[in-house]
């Protein structure tokens, strides 16, 4: 989450640090998934706090035993820029990569529910106070990304570099 050392020294000096709820307490480096229980059914939820959702590998590891992804965020930092909408798009990519529905709660950004194919199934607009009531599904199984991670991309990049190097060696031009 948003944890800044010595941020108390900066309050009043830098406007950025005067935002409400702009600092959280540091938690343990490794945390277990949260178990959601509703109507007698329960499932693990992989949690990403704020911008943690931007890190595919981290969310991939958390999602291994989870049936749903969740992210809680404070998008106040972005103001009225396109930042909150980009943040939501990043979260949608995590839903697709992991084949899991994503529940996203934002106190000043876009709150929404995204299905396992990245489709927005419900949302509250930015700067709107309200409650989003919608349905979601608990998912199981793996996707190519959840099984292999970034390795296929790295192998393709390596092959491209080797191919370009080989071509430069033969023709002297890339």
Regions found by a protein language model. Name each.
Residues 1-174:
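Enzyme catalytic cores with a strong preference for nitrogen-chemistry domains
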């Amino acid at each position: 989450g948003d944890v800044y050392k010595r941020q108390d020294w900066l309050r009043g000096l830098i406007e950025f640090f005067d935002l409400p709820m702009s600092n959280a307490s540091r938690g343990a480096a490794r945390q277990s998934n949260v178990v959601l229980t509703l109507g007698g059914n329960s499932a693990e939820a992989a949690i990403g706090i704020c911008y943690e959702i931007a890190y595919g590998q981290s969310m991939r590891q958390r999602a291994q035993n989870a049936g749903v992804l969740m992210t809680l965020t404070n998008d106040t930092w972005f103001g009225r820029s396109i930042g909150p909408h980009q943040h939501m798009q990043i979260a949608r990519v995590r839903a697709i990569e992991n084949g899991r529905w994503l529940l996203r709660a934002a106190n000043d950004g876009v709150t929404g529910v995204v299905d396992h194919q990245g489709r927005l199934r419900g949302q509250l607009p930015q700067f709107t106070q309200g409650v989003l009531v919608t349905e979601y599904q608990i998912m199981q199984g793996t996707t190519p990304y959840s099984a292999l991670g970034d390795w296929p991309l790295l192998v393709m990049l390596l092959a491209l570099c080797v191919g370009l190097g080989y071509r430069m060696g033969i023709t002297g031009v890339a």
